[in-house]
Amino acid sequence: DYTGPWNPSPGQHSSYNHARRGISFWKNKVGINPSKLTLGVPFYGYDFQNSTTVKSFTYGSMVDSDVSNSEKDNVGNKYYNGRPTIANKVKLASQNLSGIMIWRLGADSFTEYSLLETIHKTYTDLGVETTNLCGN
């Protein structure tokens, strides 16, 4: 996370650009083989209520309050990853990375707005076989 309760400055904690820069750092500055990198994606967000209070929430709760939130990355001072950002991160991870890691699966929306379903659909659309993507 690039921001959160330890840094109550409102902003995106896990943007696409943060992911891209992080991957670039590990590949180009440190020399890690991309196939050894796994991209973590959040199924949660942070609500920067004021300058001293930051609370976490689930992606599912955002969709429960308004299904159009699934297409956004923030509502006011609530920051999270919506379906378009998750799909773009999957495309990024499909460029020779080992895959996607989800924190926290139980925070998903178990509806047609599911982030897990977005991940599966994006990998499928890219022609990536998904049956062997689960680790131990």
Regions found by a protein language model. Give the residues of each.
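Low-complexity, flexible helical/coil segments
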Residues: 21-27, 73-77, 133-136
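Acidic/aromatic/glycine-rich contiguous surface patches that form carbohydrate-binding/processing clefts
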Residues: 82-136
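Soluble or luminal CAZymes and related metallo-dependent hydrolases
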Residues: 14-21, 78-85, 111
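Substrate-binding surface in catalytic domains of secreted glycosidases
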Residues: 1-64
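Hydrophobic, secondary-structure "cap" segments at the distal end of domains
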Residues: 41-99
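Generic detector of bulky aromatic hydrophobic side chains
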Residues: 26, 33-39, 77, 92-93, ...
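Short, surface-exposed, polar/charged, turn-prone segments marking secondary-structure boundaries
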Residues: 16, 20, 65-70, 128-131
